[in-house]
């Protein structure tokens, strides 16, 4: 049986990490695309030469033309300018919006049946623009945000309680930014909700609040430490979890930036919510109940995303007609 074709649009740090993980998990053949001549070709060759050592079979190629995306089953988009110290995700908007228009046109022409995962920041606005530019069904275009944010939350909680990350579940909703909403009542250790663990004396509410705040600023913390770029190992691993659920019809429940059209009271926007990802793309949006402070925080996050989307509409009004 022929292997699935996975196109990586953008061959920087995340793109290279994605390519290697795809091989290690034997998810399919890889084509790496980038506008920088030689970069996708060189990285593809380098990773391909690791296959005899790592023990996987896959075909790798690099390209500078969108034609290489032809018939890709999955497209993962990392193209754009990375976030740098002192730069907010909002600062990236106008530059990366133009990139999404170009990428969307390429996907529309050569891979109209693909499942598309966007990683480019500011994420919630960029995945909205990418879906508009590509014209693909909304259920086939998602943004990688919640899996990463939840993974950071899980790691910090596991470290706090000195338990395995495998026994920690966490939910982070809303936009991928400072207004994200880590939900403590839906986050557990071996099935025990965080509020109960506070009552049991395992930790304090003040400490949980500190972890929530660190989760919200998880990306910025790494940017400030690296000084030359942003995170790439965890973002790549998060996108691979989404791609694998689609390719293997695993139907995992994952928090992603998904298109909402009435769910959670939101219309025509991409916001981080739990979804089921299977062979049809986003097969179900899990509309959990939000009340009190959680609802207020979610609405605030949605408003922040709306602000970015409105800015996109002003910069590229023609997107609305697609």
Swiss-Prot record:
UniProt keyword Oxidoreductase, yes or no: yes
Active site residues per record: 176
Keywords: NAD, Oxidoreductase, Tricarboxylic acid cycle
The keyword Lipid metabolism is assigned to this record: no
Family matches, as Gene3D superfamilies: Lactate dehydrogenase/glycoside hydrolase, family 4, C-terminal, NAD(P)-binding Rossmann-like Domain
Binding site for NAD(+): 10-15, 34, 96, 119-121
Catalysed reaction, written as an equation: (S)-malate + NAD(+) = oxaloacetate + NADH + H(+)
Biological processes per GO annotation: lactate metabolic process; tricarboxylic acid cycle
Gene Ontology molecular function, alphabetical: L-lactate dehydrogenase activity; L-malate dehydrogenase (NAD+) activity
Residues binding substrate, per UniProt: 83, 89, 121, 152
EC number: 1.1.1.37
Functional summary from the UniProt entry: Catalyzes the reversible oxidation of malate to oxaloacetate.
Assigned protein family: Belongs to the LDH/MDH superfamily. MDH type 3 family.
Name of the protein this chain belongs to: Malate dehydrogenase
Gene it is expressed from: mdh
